Regions:
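Short edge beta-strands and adjacent beta->alpha junctions
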Residues: 27-167
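Proline-centered linker/hinge motifs at extracellular inter-domain junctions
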Residues: 168-172
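Surface-exposed, flexible coil segments in extracellular/virion-facing regions
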Residues: 206-230
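Flexible, low-complexity segments enriched for small/polar residues
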Residues: 267, 271-274, 525, 529, ...
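N-terminal accessory alpha/beta regions
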Residues: 279-385
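Acidic, Ser/Thr
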Residues: 191-201, 212
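C-terminal edge beta-strand
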Residues: 251-260
Length: 796
């Protein structure tokens, strides 16, 4: 990669170039200069984004600038800008302004200038080339001249800097060219070089390799030498930095290494990060890269749950029980169907998967609040905050009216403070009942496990959360479940409250102050990272993560690398790109998780190209009647403790956790086999020959389902089934292994499946007596055997 210090020129030459550029700038680009006159040299850097308020909250990130706000950004130390820089050259972009305004950029610590750096109108993206002196600690300040309440995002792309032209210069470093590896190859030779100006006299040089971006698990054989070997534990895109010091100044250069995953690991990754790989998706993701796919998913438009108008809790005459109107407005039927169609076809697979995990932590059950208009705002909170900040999620879920109704906060007053929500936010939603180390292991003393809180903390939170209730009613006296709860000041307890870690809220605060302070107290507790992080690992990757895995995720929760706590994107990256989640094999025997019924069903359908019964459209999502007999009725968990407890021990597993085994029994195991039998062998009456189907609903009132039905695409598997001339079923077994088991089929299972398929002659269809043929029946048998096998039902 080209060295960041690759060109030097005089300041006058550069400013002259800016003046020429000013004469030819595009309509939405301006050029200005704000420079402290010094005897300087100008050094270019590879264009680098130093500030972007559109990304997660952080020192050089979001949120957007607000009207009247001044914010300071550190520039030195980023993008190859040394601490000695006197000024920086950058491109300033403003985007998404809510109103017309101006941005003033100037040295931090100095007075706000009167001249604007860039002017803009509402909704218009504009850019400006700027040279600005750096102030205190290499920082620049930005003032937003907009009306109060209006916001705008700003982006700083650095292209160069000025520094004193005399004295010692840092070494000029070249880390080497960018590189690519395809696993299982995971080692690379690095040959960095550097040059220096010979100052100071008698200088001694020290080199150091480091990792500035990418998954953990990188090892250098000689990290203090410019020439070294580097080994990667997992696929991903890595930025490696070579820094060289002359005992006074240091220079550095970066190179990028893209490590491509093996095909089995890509398929395993898609099982973890989505609702299962779809046909032909794996090659695309493998070429793209796992970390790049994650970032693309962060940007993907949300599918989710569209907002619904409010509905009365009293069923009107036109919605009698057992009518389509009643079904659609007073039962969870539409939301359950939407959950399954989002899971099957949504382009935002990662958001939907994380939101499903959050639903299992922050439980509101449709069994108690079945009306779609009332439950939808809760589901939208989960979707909206899946990639946001955990503190924001805590705040929005606390004031969500469905949650308030489900756990009784909506009726909690100073005279009757309710302990239900305070107890569950502690026990289930944030810190748990036992003090944890960062690696998720329990802390103990002479009395046993150390409790996280006692009854006095529950009492304190109950008082802090008093006074919140339903928002303004809609016409006709319809209760407001659409908007967050509102505060009734007279119903709030204004006495002092004891919170976690001995923190006391002072008396006299209003309800909003108490609620925010209480949530901050919960959010900043050191238990949140390991307690929530471990559960997310269990729901996405493995039921029994190692303490080291949990500790790495806790570290990402505590600090995203920008000093921000609770960044869900950082947590998701840490989980999915961790070496224990990635690699060429499933790891230890304890690795993996039982697929819960909803995920098992959707993964099966996605892998087999599920469409409508006639194969022309999406399936209708009417699948909850299929998972309910298996122990899981989606969006309707039986209690606030979710569908299954995260600390449930799998029977006979020697203490290993298996949360999903909490709803798995001999009956539900047989139910899975029966469902696969129906799914694979039901071809009678299906609209398309060769597409087994769950037939569309034929009820003229359409009370029990939509009309699309669901069918599977077996046509792509038939060519692998062999022929009478070449009857070996090995190609079909290999393809089923690749598509459903990610190449992990055991030798014993392969032998058994092969024997079963050999018993079926691979004949072609002979209508009218045999419209399917032996090849098709081989495919049916192979799919049945794999989908019902433990090796598929346990995701590894």
């Amino acid at each position: 990669m080209q060295s960041p210090r690759n060109r030097r020129t005089g300041i006058g030459v550069f400013v002259a170039a800016l003046l020429v550029a000013r004469l030819v700038h595009a309509e939405d680009t301006e050029v200005s200069a704000l420079v402290t006159p010094v005897a300087s040299g100008f050094y270019t850097v590879m264009p680098c984004r130093a500030v972007d308020t559109r990304i997660g909250v952080g020192p050089n990130g979001g949120p957007a600038l607000g009207g009247g706000e001044t914010r300071v950004f550190g520039i030195a130390g980023r993008c190859g800008i040394p601490n000695s820089a006197r000024a920086v050259a950058l491109n300033l972009t403003v985007t998404g302004p809510a109103a017309a305004g101006t941005i003033l950029v100037y040295p931090a610590g100095e007075s706000t200038p009167s001249a604007s750096t860039i002017n803009f109108t509402a909704g218009r993206t504009r850019a400006n080339n700027v040279v600005v002196a750096t102030g205190e600690a290499g920082q620049v300040a930005a003032f937003c001249g907009m009306p109060p309440g209006a916001t705008v995002d700003v982006i700083f792309d650095v292209v160069g800097y000025f520094e004193d032209a005399t004295g010692n210069k840092p070494p000029v470093v070249a880390a080497g060219p960018d590189a690519a590896l395809a696993m299982p190859a995971n080692s690379l030779a690095l040959s960095g070089t550097f040059s220096d100006d010979g100052k100071p006299a008698g200088a001694t040089y020290a080199a150091a390799w480091s990792v500035t971006a990418g998954p953990p698990g990188v090892a250098f054989s000689a990290p203090a030498s410019p020439s070294t070997n580097v080994t990667f534990a997992a696929a991903g895109t890595y930025t490696l930095r070579l820094t060289v010091s002359d005992s006074d100044r240091a220079g550095f250069d970066d190179l990028t290494v893209k490590v491509t995953a093996t095909l089995p690991d890509v398929l395993r990754f898609l099982d973890q990060a989505s609702f299962g790989p779809a046909p032909d998706q794996s090659d695309t993701v493998r070429t793209q890269g796992l970390s790049e796919w994650i970032e693309e998913q962060f940007r993907a438009p949300e599918t989710g749950y569209p907002p619904l108008p409010p509905e009365s809790g009293t069923t009107p005459a036109e919605c009698p029980y057992n009518s389509v109107c009643y079904r659609d407005k007073y039962t969870t039927y539409p939301l359950q169907n939407l959950f399954f169609t989002n899971a099957l076809y949504g382009g935002d697979q990662l958001r939907q998967k994380v939101a499903w995990a959050l639903h299992k932590i922050f439980v509101v059950s449709g069994a108690d609040i079945p009306m779609p208009s009332r439950l939808t705002p809760y589901l939208r909170v989960l979707n909206r905050n899946a990639f946001g900040n955990f503190r924001t999620l805590l705040g929005e879920i606390t004031l969500n009216t469905a949650m308030g109704r489900y756990l009784d906060m909506v009726t909690s007053t100073r005279t009757r403070p309710n302990e239900n929500y305070p107890r569950e936010i502690l026990q289930l939603f944030s810190v748990g009942t036992v003090r944890l180390n960062p690696d998720g292991t329990e802390q103990s003393d002479a009395n046993g496990p150390v409790p996280t809180y006692d009854q006095s903390v529950v009492d304190g939170l109950a008082k802090a959360f008093t006074g919140w209730t339903y928002g303004t009613q809609f016409p006709g006296g319809v209760t407001n479940y659409i908007d967050p709860m509102v505060l009734v000041p007279g119903n709030h307890d204004t006495t002092a409250k004891l919170l976690l870690r001995g923190v006391t809220l002072p008396a006299g605060q209003d309800g909003t102050q108490d609620l925010n302070a209480a949530l901050d107290n919960v959010f900043t507790d050191p238990n949140v990272g390991p307690f929530i992080g471990k559960q997310l690992i269990q729901m996405l990757v493995t039921s029994n993560p190692s303490p080291a895995f949990v500790a790495r995720v806790t570290s990402a929760f505590d600090d995203n690398g920008w000093g921000v706590r609770g960044d869900m994107k950082a947590v998701i990256r840490a989980i999915l790109l961790d070496p224990e989640a990635r690699g060429t094999g499933p790891g230890a025997p304890s690795f993996g998780r039982l697929r819960e019924p909803a995920l098992w069903l959707v993964a099966s359908l996605r892998a087999l190209g599920a469409q409508s019964a006639d194969g022309t459209a999406n399936a209708d999502g009417y699948l909850s009647p299929r998972t309910t007999p298996l122990g899981q009725n989606p969006l309707r968990p039986a209690t606030v403790f979710s569908y299954f407890p995260p600390d449930y021990e799998a029977p006979g597993a020697g203490g290993l956790l298996g949360p999903e085994f909490g709803i798995h029994s001999a009956t539900t195991a047989l139910g899975r086999a029966n469902f696969v039998n129906t799914l694979v062998y039901n071809t009678s009456g299906c609209p398309v020959v060769g597409r087994p189907c769950l037939r569309p609903n034929t009820d003229p009132n359409n009370l029990n389902g939509n009309t699309n039905g669901v069918s599977l695409d077996f046509a792509s598997l038939v060519p692998f089934a062999g022929s009478l001339a070449a009857p070996d079923p090995a190609p079909l077994v290999d393809e089923l292994d690749r598509r459903l088991l990610h190449g992990t089929m055991s030798a014993a299972m392969r032998t058994e499946v092969t024997q079963a398929l050999n018993a079926i002659a691979p004949t072609d269809p002979v209508p009218p007596g045999d419209v399917l043929g032996g090849k098709f029946r081989r495919v049916q048998a192979g799919i049945y055997l794999v989908l019902t096998a433990s090796q598929f039902q346990v995701e590894r």
